[in-house]
Amino acid sequence: MSETNVQGSLAEAPKAAVKRVEQGVKLRGYDKVSRNPVKIIATDAVPRKPDWIRVRLSSSPSVEAIKQKLRKLNLHSVCEEASCPNLSECFSHGTATFMIMGDICTRRCPFCDVAHGRPNALDENEPTHLAQAIAEMNLKYVVITSVDRDDLRDGGAGHFAKCISESRKYSPNLKIEVLVPDFRGRMDVALDILRESPPDVFNHNLETVPRLYKQARPGADYAWSLLLLKRFKEAAPDVPTKSGLMLGIGEEIEEVKQVMRDLRAHNTDMLTLGQYLAPSKDHLPVVRFVHPDEFKELADYGYEIGFKQVASGPLVRSSYHADKQAAGETIS
């Protein structure tokens, strides 16, 4: 399998004027990642996706109905904000992953399509609006995720807890998975809050191997993220823990297997592995497209070392068919 860089490049990019960070203003592309330690030089070359990566794009009435409902209640879905390739499929099945605490992130991760900037104040009505939307859509399993909110004293944990509690009040039989940020510098207070309102699945993505953290997750720490997963499991031993990795940004398969072993050593139960697809030429470049056989090999290895559930395939994403993942069904 070739390791040729097929989109963009990493280097010390020439300096250009950068927009100021102002409250409520979204920064994307170069304006978002320009201050990152590893620079990205944009390219107009568009890599050809292999045959095994096929995404059906559609805009059915059910998709538009969900979008309109989210707009009406001032809610966001990570499906749209992060340009997920599975948006049409999930929306068409009447499911969505909700993104709380706004649509502006305090981090500058170059793989992510969510905007960076100085976020607005939290919407105190969001937990109720979220619960109402879930009830109106008659959902049985939801994923609640968020932007990073390093500006908040609890990292947003209290808002997560309110959303969990309010959603269960409106939908008593609802299953809730949370995909949380790393609560950098605020782990103790965040865990104290979340153990009082635990979800049904606790998910925090490592995203990549530690060697690539500087370029892919500036501001994050590999050991910290592992510790967050371990400590939540200690606080709520009956709640499954979950993490995910994106492949194709320069990692080696043996490095991925080491991360998998690290996750198991920190009592993580579930794992997702998917192909990274760059949202634009200004994002982290795709180094290679990982073959489905390699995803299958990693899934088999995951079960060998004790994961209870592994979803591994080119279009797998952390919240893709999360209900089926939680039920132990095979996802690829």
Curated annotation (Swiss-Prot):
The lineage of its organism: Bacteria, Pseudomonadati, Pseudomonadota, Gammaproteobacteria, Oceanospirillales. [4Fe-4S] cluster 1 binds at C79, C84, C90, S319. InterPro entries: Aldolase_TIM, Elp3/MiaA/NifB-like_rSAM, LIAS_N, Lipoyl_synth, rSAM. It is found in: Cytoplasm. This is Lipoyl synthase. Binds 2 [4Fe-4S] clusters per subunit. One cluster is coordinated with 3 cysteines and an exchangeable S-adenosyl-L-methionine. SMART domains: Elp3 (SM00729). The keyword Transcription does not apply. PROSITE patterns: RADICAL_SAM. Keywords: 4Fe-4S, Cytoplasm, Iron, Iron-sulfur, Metal-binding, S-adenosyl-L-methionine, Transferase. Belongs to the radical SAM superfamily. Lipoyl synthase family. NCBIfam families: lipA, PRK05481.1, PRK12928.1. Pathway: Protein modification; protein lipoylation via endogenous pathway; protein N(6)-(lipoyl)lysine from octanoyl-[acyl-carrier-protein]: step 2/2. [4Fe-4S] cluster 2 binds at C105, C109, C112. Its EC number is 2.8.1.8. Its cofactor is [4Fe-4S] cluster. It comes from Hahella chejuensis (strain KCTC 2396).
